[in-house]
């Protein structure tokens, strides 16, 4: 058999297809991160994590690669610039980052700084996001778009921000909202910059398809759009409308759905121009997807188009319809948050070593002394001895039947616990023996293709699924998971990944594989005393902000890293993860009050001689140390 290579590992984890040329495997068998596609510079993830641990930064660690963030902004801007040139498009393109995708200050700040030369803007949907965007725009002159529902306070804040020099556009979502805007504008004497969101009949596809279509949550129907135009005319505010916006959903997997929305949305733009609305911008919303599984398909974790194809279709469709309708082409805006930030962060954590010295039954003695076994267990031994490639199906089915029979006999009291344990042990041996034969078969019989799941072992990783990758639990989103080391060795254990929460839902059983979605993740058998790390990739969009504190596992340690040609990498920022006292504070516990209550109770016990002073003091020290410690597992 040929020696396992890093190319084999790249295939089974599909790195070349989902990695966007930002991730690779080096000759040491470690995962590397590149600042931009095809860059000759790289950071060895295993070396980086080892260095961070030497700095007392413990896993789980969220690694944020800021150069990738800059590169994604540049890539999106570049493909639109090329599409504009190729199609002789007479207007401009501008990207807006929807900060709901990842509101972390350092992330938004980096996007604001990187995006200056690309005239990037920020999109907000709430008062806290508005305030955050205003703070980031200060000194940077970043334009801001306001979507979502707005109350009077929100509208007043925007209008006075406009008065003092901020470039902010209010996007009207509902007719009653427009009435409020008109009222506040008249009362303050400040004319707003307005956009209108239209509700398209066209829909996206996948888990967010309801963002578009006639039943969408946001936007004006065509009849309401006509009414809005009339209201603006009556209040002499029609000239304040400069933008038309539509959005048909996040992570649109099929390019034809995007084309349909572009055609309908641009037709509405053209008709509004003919009605005398001097629109200057067409905001096509989000939807630009990320190929999480690398299949380049219309599956919900993938996309069947490239970044270049997306940009070309946007520019071509808008120009074609505007030329046909005889109206000026608009400046185009997109809100591609997911595609901007998904790739830039990686969560790395340790797998808890499952190597134990647990004594298992002496298999050889079971085989040689089978006459002492119960009839059910003896039948399993006979199957093990006689397995060959000609009887695989029958042997597999008989084994499953006998293991079920052993459970029934145990429940009825006819099989003791030792005999049931022997049945389980022999069953696992049979499955492994069958697997060793199946692996060599071409093709694998249909009935045996799924049986390998019975070999799947649960590997426990030091993280909270609900905190770090909640979409995996909530919507069955696929994220690439790869060991960051030993990729020059064949991974010989089929696994599922369980977190350390006390919840059965805290387990991942669907993974990115060589041929798309797979139900088991190949990992290595962990060596004694080995620190074995796995990385969760493409988690930069939504995961950090949607994460919750199940079991009070808090934010992880986070490290901002930039590439450095001299030292390979530079640590810009370290954000310490939540300590136990911080997680408790979220749910209204005060650490000092906890210590006070426990101390008072211990003093009573000391006075009654139930515990010694030394025991009381030692316990308080341990409790205080626990309050100051990371919420995740240590040694």
From Swiss-Prot:
Q: Which UniProt keywords apply?
A: Decarboxylase, Lyase, Magnesium, Metal-binding, Polyamine biosynthesis, Pyridoxal phosphate, Spermidine biosynthesis
Entry-annotated residues carrying N6-(pyridoxal phosphate)lysine: 100
Keyword Nucleotide-binding attributed: no
> Which InterPro entries is this protein grouped with?
Ala_racemase/Decarboxylase_C, Arg_decarb_HB, Arg_decarbox_C, Arg_decrbxlase, De-COase2_CS, De-COase2_N, De-COase2_pyr-phos_BS, Orn/DAP/Arg_de-COase
Q: Which SUPFAM superfamilies match?
A: Alanine racemase C-terminal domain-like, PLP-binding barrel
Q: Which cofactor does it need?
A: Mg(2+); pyridoxal 5'-phosphate
What is the reaction catalyzed? L-arginine + H(+) = agmatine + CO2
Per its UniProt entry, what is the enzyme's top EC class, as one word?
A: lyase
Give me the residues that bind substrate, please: 282-292
The record describes the protein's role as:
Catalyzes the biosynthesis of agmatine from arginine.
The entry sums up its family as follows: Belongs to the Orn/Lys/Arg decarboxylase class-II family. SpeA subfamily.
Protein's name according to its UniProt entry: Biosynthetic arginine decarboxylase
Q: What is the lineage of its organism?
A: Bacteria, Pseudomonadati, Thermodesulfobacteriota, Desulfuromonadia, Geobacterales
């Amino acid at each position: 058999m040929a020696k396992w290579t890093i190319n084999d590992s790249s295939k089974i984890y599909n790195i070349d297809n989902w990695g966007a040329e930002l991730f690779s495997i080096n000759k040491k068998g470690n995962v590397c991160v590149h600042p931009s596609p095809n860059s000759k510079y790289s950071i060895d993830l295993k070396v980086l994590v080892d260095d961070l641990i030497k700095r007392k930064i413990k896993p789980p660690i969220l690694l944020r690669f800021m150069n990738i963030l800059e590169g994604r902004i540049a890539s999106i801007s570049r493909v639109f610039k090329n599409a504009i040139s190729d199609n002789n498009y007479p207007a401009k393109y501008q990207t807006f980052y929807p900060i709901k995708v990842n509101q972390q200050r350092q992330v938004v700040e980096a996007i604001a700084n990187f995006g200056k030369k690309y005239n990037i803007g920020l999109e907000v949907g709430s008062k806290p996001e508005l305030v955050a965007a205003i703070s980031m725009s200060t000194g940077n002159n970043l334009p801001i778009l306001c979507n979502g529902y707005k109350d009077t306070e929100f509208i007043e804040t925007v209008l006075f921000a406009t008065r003092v020099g901020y470039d902010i556009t209010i996007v009207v979502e509902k007719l009653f909202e427009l009435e409020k805007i008109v009222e506040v504008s008249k009362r303050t004497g400040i004319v707003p910059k307005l956009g209108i969101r239209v509700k398209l009949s066209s829909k996206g596809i996948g888990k967010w398809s309801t963002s578009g279509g006639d039943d969408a949550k946001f936007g004006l129907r065509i009849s309401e759009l006509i009414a809005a135009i009339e209201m603006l005319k009556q209040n002499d505010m029609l000239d304040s409308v400069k933008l038309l916006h539509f959005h048909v959903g996040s992570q649109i997997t099929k390019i034809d759905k995007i084309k349909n929305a572009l055609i309908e949305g641009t037709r509405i733009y053209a008709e509004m121009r003919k009605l005398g609305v001097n629109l200057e911008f067409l905001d096509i919303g989000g939807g630009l997807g990320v190929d999480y599984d690398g299949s380049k398909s219309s599956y919900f974790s993938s996309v069947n188009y490239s970044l270049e194809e997306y940009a070309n279709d946007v520019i071509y469709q808008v120009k074609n319809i505007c030329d046909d309708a005889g109206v000026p082409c608009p400046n185009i805006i997109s809100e591609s948050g997911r595609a901007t930030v998904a790739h830039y962060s990686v969560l790395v954590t340790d797998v808890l070593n499952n190597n134990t010295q647990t004594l298992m039954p002496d298999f050889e003695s079971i085989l040689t002394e089978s006459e002492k076994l119960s009839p059910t267990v003896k039948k399993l031994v006979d199957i093990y001895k006689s397995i060959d490639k000609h009887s695989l199906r029958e042997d597999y089915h008989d084994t499953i039947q006998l293991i079920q029979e052993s459970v029934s006999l145990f429940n009825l009291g006819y099989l003791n616990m030792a005999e049931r344990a022997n049945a389980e042990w022999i069953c696992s041996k049979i499955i492994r023996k069958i697997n060793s034969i199946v692996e060599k078969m071409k093709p694998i019989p249909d009935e045996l293709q799924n049986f390998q799941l019975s070999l799947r072992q649960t590997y426990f990783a030091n993280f909270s699924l609900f905190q770090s990758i909640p979409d995996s639990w909530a919507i069955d989103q696929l994220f690439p998971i790869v060991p960051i080391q030993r990729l020059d060795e064949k991974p010989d254990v089929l696994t599922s990944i369980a977190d350390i929460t006390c919840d059965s839902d805290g387990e991942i059983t669907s993974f990115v594989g060589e041929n798309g979605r797979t139900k088991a993740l190949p990992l290595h058998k962990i060596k004694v005393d080995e620190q074995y790390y796995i990385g969760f990739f493409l988690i930069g969009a939504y995961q950090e902000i949607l994460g919750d504190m199940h079991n009070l596992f808090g934010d992880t340690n986070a490290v901002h890293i930039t590439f450095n040609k001299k030292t390979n990498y530079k640590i810009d920022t370290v954000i310490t993860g939540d300590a136990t006292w911080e997680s408790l504070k979220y749910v209204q516990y005060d650490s000092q009050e906890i210590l006070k209550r426990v101390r008072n109770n211990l003093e009573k016990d000391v006075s009654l001689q139930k515990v010694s002073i030394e025991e009381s003091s030692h316990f308080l020290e341990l409790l205080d140390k626990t309050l100051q410690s990371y919420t995740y597992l240590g040694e």
